[in-house]
């Protein structure tokens, strides 16, 4: 311990006056508890320490994980402290278990107290990761990985599309064939809604009827037609484009209010470039199987179809389908092929329902229009009010836009939505509760306010994201992908790397044209074990200089798990900021020595054995005295670095200390007779340091939660311990990271500005070690 600090020197004089320095030798004749309390309070860098704080920065969490998957497949379940899939990931594994279909796992693991979310991964036989971010609530994590309806490796198109309305064909082929026989052939320039006494119409019986049936003549018909409403007494006008007829619309033909245009199998409407077929109010179209509307012109529906449904079971292939104006919305039901350069809809309530194929350069619906896709849809820009993806459907777009609030998406089981460019997730995307949906996105659009919004992806949706750029610690700095994994994925939603989704959608050439099956290449995920740092002050039970670098250990921990019989700990002696002999040991609470088959050592074994000749610890693989498992790590910190005799420089603590180029590492291997759960770092791993004073037993310095001596050691006297308890000082810290410890003589509060705040209230600022307030720390 360094004795050149004024506070420490003052303390030593005071302590001498009350014979405190000899208290560990049971010489307490002048002990004064009040004066000792004052000394502790004056020398420790933080006043008014949290009386209920135990100085722990980690906690034990229990995970409950339901695993579903394919029968006969063995899965790995791994829990990480961060996103394991990011190319820049530093995620550390916290727990690992094996599982099969239907397994419910319960496993306890340790993590930083500051950690509020973990990433639970299911890894299949191809080493594909399905990852679910899960919030830690009340010390527990609950996750569901995989989906209960998956039992085989094959999947066929479902019969039902429960969320997509269906429509029976309005006519049979026989009905239209019969009707056209009696229908009146139209002539150029007719107003099909004319009254029975109007001009030349008076001699034609059809104009006396309430429901009037007309047909386009055979061959090519180029002349204009129109209807102008109900003033002529007609209630409905039906125009059949029969087989063998081609209706050429070369300008604009407008049909007001009461017209249905029916294209029979083999009938054709061609709309020329710059020409428009205009349907207003209760006018609408019906395209039978085999019928077609083609050309470079426009179909324009305005002021709604008044409750009538437009129906296409043939082919519509034109430039623009435009729907605008007032009314309650246009219903357009597609059972055939709809090919467009552009679909533009702005009439509130308009719904485009697809049970066939839709291909468009742009689909641009405002935020009061809807798309319901039960089959195949492909577009460039994709914008709408709401979207429903039906059971076993596929939609592909280049850009998934956003045009206002409530642009929500519902995805049913076996549906797949793919965006090859940027996709806005400024919305709620709701997946199935039974079965799985796949959301494939190249890049999530970076929209202002996304992180603060209530947007989410929820239920059984797998998100396959290509751009996994992760930025930002605070929510207001999150990149879109950081938002997704930290907040956006909810209620069982998961994510994976491209091509790795546990999802099968076979292409059938009809509704599923591209389909999906995962590749067999493994995910490239580096497994990093958690490293905890143990930082000690050696002058216990006297006050120290509180730079917490007298001994600094980095300990690599095994992942938590159940039923293990082998434990491995890798211990790095990172710093020795003391000039006296110090040793270190590990007591594992919960392991009785009778259950130990063997304790062995890998790297560092020779230095360890030779250092134990100092006598602080037994020179054995574990100590024989007592029932607890106590493993000596080294008996002389300087010796393992090659310093003997009186050579005891400060090592690797900055300032004038001696730097270390090679860190001493000791591998500790423990074999047990009977399986146990991995011991908790918070409640079970008691790393401590010790020195030999004037007493027969060594003096030990433990973390506060392990503040009891081993069989071969001692703490301070009872009276001193009572004062320490009242003041609640500490001489040891366990930091759940590679701790950048203070340099020589730098008080910890000068290195970490939030340390004092945490000490005052240890329920706050539990991540203080992430905020370095000076350059007086040792980073590595």
Where are these regions (language model features)?
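Bacterial N-terminal signal peptides that target proteins for export
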Residues: 1-10
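C-terminal motif of bacterial Sec signal peptides marking the signal peptidase cleavage site
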Residues: 19-22
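Acidic/polar, low-complexity intrinsically disordered N-terminal segments immediately downstream
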Residues: 24-201, 490-542
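Short, well-ordered beta-strand segments enriched in hydrophobic/aromatic residues
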Residues: 63, 555, 566-575
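Extended low-complexity, serine/threonine- and proline-enriched intrinsically disordered segments
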Residues: 72-87, 578-621, 683-695
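Extracellular beta-strand-rich, repetitive "passenger/adhesive" scaffolds
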Residues: 163-499
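Beta-strand elements of well-folded, non-transmembrane domains
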Residues: 557-561, 573-579, 590-592
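A eukaryote-biased signal for long
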Residues: 621-780
């Amino acid at each position: 311990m360094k004795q050149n600090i004024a506070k420490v020197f003052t303390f030593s004089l005071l302590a001498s006056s009350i014979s405190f320095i000899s208290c560990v030798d049971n010489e307490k004749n002048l002990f004064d508890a009040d004066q000792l309390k004052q000394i502790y309070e004056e020398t420790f860098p933080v006043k008014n320490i949290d009386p209920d704080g135990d100085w722990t920065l980690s906690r034990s969490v229990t995970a409950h994980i339901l695993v579903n998957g394919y029968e006969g497949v063995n899965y790995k379940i791994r829990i990480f402290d961060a996103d394991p899939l990011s190319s820049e990931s530093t995620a550390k594994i916290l727990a690992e278990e094996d599982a099969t279909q239907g397994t419910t796992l319960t496993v306890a693991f340790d993590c930083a107290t500051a950690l509020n979310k973990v990433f639970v991964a299911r890894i299949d036989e191809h080493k594909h990761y399905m990852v679910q971010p899960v919030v830690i609530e009340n010390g527990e994590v609950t996750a569901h990985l995989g989906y209960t309806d998956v039992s085989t490796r094959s999947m066929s198109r479902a019969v039902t599309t429960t969320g997509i309305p269906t429509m029976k064909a309005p006519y049979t082929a026989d009905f239209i064939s019969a009707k056209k026989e009696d229908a009146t052939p139209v002539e150029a320039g007719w107003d099909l809604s004319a009254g029975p006494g109007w001009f030349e119409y008076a001699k034609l019986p059809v104009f006396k009827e309430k429901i009037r049936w007309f047909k386009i003549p055979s061959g090519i018909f180029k002349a204009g037609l129109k209807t102008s409403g109900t003033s002529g007494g007609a209630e409905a006008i039906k125009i059949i484009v029969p087989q063998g007829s081609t209706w050429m619309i070369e300008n604009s033909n407008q049909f007001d209010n009461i017209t249905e245009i029916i294209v029979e199998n083999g009938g054709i409407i061609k709309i020329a470039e710059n020409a428009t077929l205009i349907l207003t109010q209760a006018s609408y179209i019906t395209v039978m199987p085999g019928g077609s509307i083609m050309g470079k012109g426009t179909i324009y529906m305005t002021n709604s179809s008044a409750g009538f449904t437009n129906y296409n079971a043939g082919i519509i292939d034109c430039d623009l389908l435009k729907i605008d104006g007032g009314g309650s919305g246009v219903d357009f039901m597609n059972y055939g092929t709809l090919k467009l350069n552009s679909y533009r809809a702005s009439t509130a309530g308009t719904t485009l329902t697809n049970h066939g194929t839709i291909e468009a350069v742009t689909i641009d619906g405002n935020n009061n229009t809807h798309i319901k896709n039960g089959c195949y849809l492909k577009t460039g820009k994709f914008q709408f009010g709401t979207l429903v993806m039906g059971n076993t459907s596929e939609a592909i777009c280049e850009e998934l836009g956003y045009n206002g609030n409530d642009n929500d998406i519902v995805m049913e089981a076996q549906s797949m939505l793919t965006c090859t460019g940027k996709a806005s997730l400024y919305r709620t995307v709701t997946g199935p509760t039974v079965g799985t949906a796949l959301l494939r996105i190249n890049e999530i659009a970076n929209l202002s306010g996304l992180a603060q919004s209530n947007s989410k992806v929820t239920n059984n949706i797998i998100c396959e994201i290509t751009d996994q750029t992760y930025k930002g610690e605070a929510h207001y700095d999150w990149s879109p992908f950081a938002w997704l994994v930290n907040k956006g994925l909810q209620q069982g939603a998961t994510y994976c790397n491209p091509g790795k989704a546990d999802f099968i959608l076979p292409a059938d050439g009809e509704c599923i044209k591209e389909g999906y099956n995962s590749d067999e290449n493994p995910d490239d995920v580096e497994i990093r074990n958690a490293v905890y740092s143990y930082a000690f002050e050696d002058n216990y039970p006297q006050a120290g200089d509180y730079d917490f670098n007298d001994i600094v250990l980095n300990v690599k921990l095994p992942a938590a798990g159940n039923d293990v019989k082998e434990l491995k700990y890798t211990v790095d002696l990172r710093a020795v900021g003391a000039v006296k002999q110090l040793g270190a040991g590990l007591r594992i609470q919960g392991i009785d020595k009778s259950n130990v088959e063997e304790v062995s050592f890998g790297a560092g074994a020779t230095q360890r054995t030779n250092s134990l000749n100092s006598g602080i610890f037994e020179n054995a693989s574990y100590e024989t005295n007592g029932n607890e498992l106590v493993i000596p790590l080294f008996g002389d910190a300087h010796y393992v670095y090659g310093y003997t005799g009186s050579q005891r420089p400060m090592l690797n603590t900055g300032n004038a200390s001696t730097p270390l180029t090679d860190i001493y590492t000791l591998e500790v291997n423990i074999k047990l007779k009977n399986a146990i759960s991995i011991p908790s770092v918070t409640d079970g791993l008691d790393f401590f340091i010790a020195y030999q004073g004037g007493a027969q037993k060594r003096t030990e310095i433990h973390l506060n939660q392990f503040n009891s001596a081993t069989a071969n050691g001692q703490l301070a006297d009872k009276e001193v311990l009572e004062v320490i308890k009242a003041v609640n000082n500490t001489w040891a810290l366990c930091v759940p990271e590679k701790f950048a410890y203070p340099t020589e003589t730098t008080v910890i509060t000068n290195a970490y500005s939030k340390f004092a705040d945490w000490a005052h209230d240890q329920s706050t600022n539990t991540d203080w070690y992430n905020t370095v307030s000076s350059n007086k720390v040792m980073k590595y």
